[in-house]
Amino acid sequence: MIEVDGLTFHYPDGTAVFEGFSWRVAPGEAWAVLGPSGCGKTTLLYLIAGLRLPLQGEIRVGGDRILRPRPQTGLILQEYGLLPWATVRENVALGLRIRGFYGPDGTHAPAGEAVTARREITQAWLDRLGLSHVAGSFPGQISGGQRQRTAIARTLSLQPDLLLMDEPFASLDAPTREDLQNLTLQLRAETGLTTVVVTHTIEEAALLGA
């Protein structure tokens, strides 16, 4: 699924992050990337997602060389990335609306995707993530756990085949964090997603990277 060959990447100040790094992730596998702050964990996710490009070497996902963001790759961040002026429902539907403009490959407008179908998909994920009762609320009106559930629903509504998660539960309280960790395991079992999770805790790495 993920093939990293001879990856070299430096920060703008010249600091070397990766030098000739190679890695393989098979379809359906779950990996946890563990390490201290500043060691390049998030940078690795951004490189796999196509948000940054290597100085040398190449990254392939699903057999395709990554030269730009890949529509089938889902990325969930610690900061949620929600639009504060949009409701929970609108935030969950955002990816589907963008796909309606640019198409599944991110470059070609589709022949047509029924608005009704998008609404049904959005509602299904609101139900699955337990968000239906706050669907009309804004991000500032709901809890951190609900905001992260919204981000997860928005990403998974697009049916990605690769899910990248950058310390998604680090800012949550312990009960909410455990709840969302278990939810992630359930969703992975249901979908067979290939998953890479960045974390700074050994316990979370052991749980989500197994």
Feature roles, as predicted:
Residues M1-G192, V196-V197, T201-I202, L208:
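ABC family nucleotide-binding domain
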